[in-house]
Amino acid sequence: MKTLLLTLVVVTIVCLDLGYTMKCKICNFDTCRAGELKVCASGEKYCFKESWREARGTRIERGCAATCPKGSVYGLYVLCCTTDDCN
């Protein structure tokens, strides 16, 4: 019985990904370079993409965030997501 309990504990620890962190695109332009992902800090649970218009055209910022950012004064669109490379 003790062996079974120990086995279950070990399997549970192995199956849990206790150190998982998000990976998001990080860039401040219209497009990101392929494969350019950043490992977010442990408290950052969201990837975001915000776009807004300025004199030179539409700008896009992508990154990691602890909470979903609200649109700025100039913000047209904010996308928040919780899976790797979703922004």
UniProtKB/Swiss-Prot annotation:
CDD domains: TFP_snake_toxin. Disulfide bonds join 24-47, 27-32, 40-64, 68-80, 81-86. Pfam families: Toxin_cobra-type (PF21947). One of its GO terms (molecular function) is toxin activity. Keywords: Acetylcholine receptor inhibiting toxin, Disulfide bond, Ion channel impairing toxin, Neurotoxin, Postsynaptic neurotoxin, Secreted, Signal, Toxin. Its main location: secreted. One of its GO terms (cellular component) is extracellular region. Belongs to the three-finger toxin family. Ancestral subfamily. Orphan group IV sub-subfamily. This is Candoxin.
